[in-house]
Amino acid sequence: MAQKVRIALDAMGGDFGPSVVVPGAGISLTRHPDTEFILFGDSAAINRQLDKHPAMKAVSRVVHTDVAITMEEKPSQALRRGRKTSSMWLALDAVRKGEADVAVSAGNTGALMAMSRFNLRMLPGIDRPAIACVWPTIRSESVVLDVGASIGADARHLASLAIMGSAMARVLFDIERPTVGLLNIGVEEVKGVEEVKEAAELLRSMDLPELEFIGFVEGDGIGKGAADVIVTEGFSGNIALKTAEGTARQIAEYLRSAMSRTWRSKIGYLFAKSAFKALRDKMDPRKVNGGVFLGLNGVVIKSHGGTDAEGFASAVDVGYEMVRYDLLTKINQTFNRDGGSLTRMPTAQEAVS
């Protein structure tokens, strides 16, 4: 029998705390019965929710703390106030100590990133973490990163994102050599800022066996599934993510409005109900909730703070899959293949000289 996946939950994270975290984890448990949970936060509030979900209660342990990080706190403030005592820190610390395999939080993104770096540290050869998400496409799904961990990136960092993203794609999609594209304003080699053009030169020159670099991808290529992995720096990646989520909700609202406008449209909806449900499920941001913090010496999943139980369940699902399919080992194997490491990665100028 396979060992259970142990998931540490920041039960106080997000807009709704235990009222979403507990039922959300319970939904994920129905899909992955080989899971157990450690919940950190206000034990009274957590236990009130666990009493409503006996199956979840049977596989959960609660660790009490009165300290919770708010969504408004700056990372530096969160570290000063919540280090060693907050529900967010304790969930991460459980991963560091080996008591849990993955931490999941819907809390303050900046605080979670700062605490993750401070507590878990970075993998060898990686300077900065990235947030990667699974993006539904016309083709199937793609890994897109960075969607908000940091602003700006030089060529070397973009190349490291490509390597980490390809490792995640191999885990999720069972692809031996994922295709990787750099997000740009055009596909021509002369277009884009210098950092992106240098990253393209670097990836071509390295000719990595773990990935197939296909060049530049424009914004519309994300939804088309132009590559298995699409790489960008965090500022533009976060804008792209929020734009896509907003567009999905906008289209869903258009459909709802159109289908209820007249009696004919209502009858038409009845005939096409299953097709509309499939479309709605495909566009539902909750189905792909759960950003993976890549580059850390531990697995951390960030859920949207305002999601509901179904959305939080998706984030827990992502954490389960990252552990079950051994993401950290695959990233390390990629970075350290044949004794190499990203610290030996040349600059673009060195690589092409």
UniProtKB/Swiss-Prot annotation:
Matches recorded under InterPro entries: FA_synthesis (IPR003664), Phospholipid_synth_PlsX-like (IPR012281)
GO CC terms, sorted: cytoplasm
UniProt-listed Gene3D superfamilies: Isopropylmalate Dehydrogenase
Pathway given in the UniProt record: Lipid metabolism; phospholipid metabolism
PANTHER family the record matches: FATTY ACID/PHOSPHOLIPID SYNTHESIS PROTEIN PLSX, PHOSPHATE ACYLTRANSFERASE
Disulfide-bonded cysteines: none
Catalytic activity: a fatty acyl-[ACP] + phosphate = an acyl phosphate + holo-[ACP]
EC number: 2.3.1.274
The protein, known as: Phosphate acyltransferase
Annotated compartments: Cytoplasm
GO biological process: fatty acid biosynthetic process; phospholipid biosynthetic process
GO molecular function: phosphate:acyl-[acyl carrier protein] acyltransferase activity
Family recorded in the similarity comment: Belongs to the PlsX family.
Signal peptide annotation: none
Major subcellular site: cytoplasm
UniProtKB keywords: Cytoplasm, Lipid biosynthesis, Lipid metabolism, Phospholipid biosynthesis, Phospholipid metabolism, Transferase
Subunit description: Homodimer. Probably interacts with PlsY.
